[in-house]
């Protein structure tokens, strides 16, 4: 029974990590299609990550649901990171 539960939880964790990585790759590929230089792309990624993380942490401290207001312009906040929709 315990082994089955551990296996199910492990598979769920792997699935979450895989999904997150896939979303990051998709966001990067969509940005690359626009034709932004790598330096600008890195700056945008860093800015979105910081904005989203700060916004989520502030809202969590107030015991409210994280509404992720900082991600705009085709971005959404997921796992405290902005990803391209």
Swiss-Prot record:
**Keyword terms, alphabetized:** Disulfide bond, Neurotoxin, Postsynaptic neurotoxin, Secreted, Signal, Toxin
UniProt-recorded name of the protein? U4-theraphotoxin-Hhn1d
| Domain of life, per lineage | Eukaryota
Where does tissue-level expression of this protein occur?
Expressed by the venom gland.
Molecular-function GO term, any one: toxin activity
Family to which this protein belongs: Belongs to the neurotoxin 12 (Hwtx-2) family. 02 (Hwtx-2) subfamily.
Please name the PROSITE patterns in this protein's record. Answer: HWTX_2
Q: Does the keyword Disulfide bond apply?
A: yes
Q: Name one Pfam family in it.
A: Toxin_20
Localization, UniProt:
Secreted
Any one annotated GO CC term:
host cell postsynaptic membrane
Q: Identify the species of origin.
A: Cyriopagopus hainanus
């Amino acid at each position: 029974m315990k082994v089955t539960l551990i296996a199910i939880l492990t598979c769920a964790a792997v699935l979450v990590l895989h999904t997150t990585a896939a979303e990051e790759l998709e966001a990067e590929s969509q940005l690359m299609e626009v034709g932004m230089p790598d330096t600008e792309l890195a700056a945008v990624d860093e800015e979105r990550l910081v904005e989203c993380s700060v916004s989520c942490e502030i809202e969590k401290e107030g015991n409210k649901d994280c509404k992720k207001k900082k991600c705009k312009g085709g971005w959404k906040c997921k796992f405290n990171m902005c990803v391209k929709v």
